[in-house]
Amino acid sequence: MIELDYLTIAFGGAIGAVLRYLVSRTINSLLPFSYIPLGTIIVNSVGSFFLSFLMFAAIEKVPLSKEAILFFGTGLLGAFTTFSTFTYETLSLIEESPARGVAYALVNLLFAFTCAYFGMILGRGKV
């Protein structure tokens, strides 16, 4: 039922968005001296790990229902991670300091891909 799918995604997304706000705000307030927005790096890295873990585990180890994938993958983790904030922050940093902006983009991508890789390994049960 399509309407139930939308509600499942919306409920997960609402939780993910609030979690992203809380985690990002907490990280950035604990480390106000940072030259880059660490909150976004943290949420994108953690979200990449858990989404990769979830999907690879669901495919290869423990089949998940469509509803669980919609809730956790599309909804919660989709809203928890934030590509739009990453691109906005990157452009803002590039305007201030091109080197800092590029470094931020590279660190964000490196951490997210590394976390996704470890999520894949653990999701497949290869550890």
Swiss-Prot record:
GO BP, sorted A to Z: cellular detoxification of fluoride
Pfam families associated with the record: CRCB
Catalysis: reaction(s): fluoride(in) = fluoride(out)
Domain of life: Bacteria
Name of the protein this chain belongs to: Fluoride-specific ion channel FluC
Record organism: Thermotoga petrophila (strain ATCC BAA-488 / DSM 13995 / JCM 10881 / RKU-1)
Compartments where found: Cell inner membrane
InterPro entries: FluC (IPR003691)
Function: Fluoride-specific ion channel. Important for reducing fluoride concentration in the cell, thus reducing its toxicity.
GO CC annotations on file: plasma membrane
Gene Ontology terms, MF aspect: fluoride channel activity; metal ion binding
Disulphide bonds in the chain: none
Family as reported in the entry's similarity comment: Belongs to the fluoride channel Fluc/FEX (TC 1.A.43) family.
Annotated membrane topology: Multi-pass membrane protein
Keyword field: Cell inner membrane, Cell membrane, Ion channel, Ion transport, Membrane, Metal-binding, Sodium, Transmembrane, Transmembrane helix, Transport
Record-listed Na(+) binding positions: 78, 81
TM spans (from-to): 4-24, 39-59, 68-88, 102-122
Activation/inhibition comment: Na(+) is not transported, but it plays an essential structural role and its presence is essential for fluoride channel function.
